[in-house]
Amino acid sequence: MPMVPFIALPLAAMALGLVLVVLHLRGIRKPLLIGLHLLLGLGALEVLVVLLKGAPGSDGLPAGDFGNVAAGFLALAAFIGLLTPILGRRSRLTGNAMLLAHVSAGVAGVLLCIAWASSL
């Protein structure tokens, strides 16, 4: 499997997330962009899992430490991102803290994906 989609999907999700943060700071909410960010992030996680575990009938790539940890961080970012609109309505501080945790886990996952891809 080529590495281009594996690197392009998380970077595209991260770039769109940066746009969404700027819009959030301006008080603008774009549900279509949020949905696209969700699809790109879950697509990146899916490609990573397929690379780690292998497609049906094939073997996966050697995961090493970076691959498994990257999958964990991306899964954590997806989980926090899905919970943020639900739990973040309680207070602005809670929403911003969850958004910071989502961004931190996502950036760590993307950087570990790149590190893992460069070590293959």
Residue ranges and their predicted role:
Residues M1-L120:
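Membrane-embedded alpha-helical bundles that constitute the cytochrome b-like, heme-associated redox core
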